[in-house]
Amino acid sequence: MNTKNKIGIFGGSFNPPHIGHLIISQYAIEMLQLDLLYIVPTYIPPHKSNDLAPFELRFKWCKITFSGPHISISDYEKNRQGISYSLYTVLYFSQLHRTKPYFITGEDSLSYIQNWHKYRDLLENCHFVVYPRYCNKPYEEHTRSVLKELYDSIIFLQAPLIQISASDIRKRIKERKSIKGMVHPQIEKQVIEYYSL
């Protein structure tokens, strides 16, 4: 059993990981006072992506992008095999640390949370933390009606709006536009080479 007791989980495809992800991780650690934040790249996303980079490449990029004494890059979802469902990741780290973890996701995810695998079980087994994205929350009323009493348990992270997205980075590469400053300098060349294919 691990003795660290304030644990965060920041999962995603990280396709590719970018500076926005790094900012989010730093704010989460500071504002939630986390002892440890796990960065957990998705192995097989529930919703298939045609341009998903191989897990090993995304994992390597995450190790370069995220660093610090309170961060650990986890390959749990690869080791588990199969489709990566957030609930099982939360349950794994909850059992590992004997604590209720903080699960961090983007504000835009709330618009379709009812499509997540056993989403009510997920919300009941973690502190569900949402960071702001560049959107106007047109779905807030819909989300409240879906989650009902669980909506009030959501923690909204007070952090700067993130104007960078992985899909925008991939699009810019296809259009031969610069991504300088959007990803870690040490992975920029590899990211451009991979998504240019």
From Swiss-Prot:
Substrates-to-products reaction catalysed: nicotinate beta-D-ribonucleotide + ATP + H(+) = deamido-NAD(+) + diphosphate
CDD domains, A to Z: NMNAT (cd02165)
A molecular-function term among this protein's GO annotations: ATP binding
Pfam family, one: CTP_transf_like
EC code: 2.7.7.18
Top-level taxon: Bacteria
Bridged cysteine pairs (disulfide): none
Annotated metabolic or biological route of this protein: Cofactor biosynthesis; NAD(+) biosynthesis; deamido-NAD(+) from nicotinate D-ribonucleotide: step 1/1
Keywords on record: ATP-binding, NAD, Nucleotide-binding, Nucleotidyltransferase, Pyridine nucleotide biosynthesis, Transferase
Gene3D superfamilies: HUPs
Listed GO biological process terms: NAD biosynthetic process
Keyword Phosphoprotein: no
Regions that span the bilayer: none
Family designation: Belongs to the NadD family.
Job description of the protein: Catalyzes the reversible adenylation of nicotinate mononucleotide (NaMN) to nicotinic acid adenine dinucleotide (NaAD).
Name of the molecule in the record: Probable nicotinate-nucleotide adenylyltransferase
Originating organism: Pseudothermotoga lettingae (strain ATCC BAA-301 / DSM 14385 / NBRC 107922 / TMO)
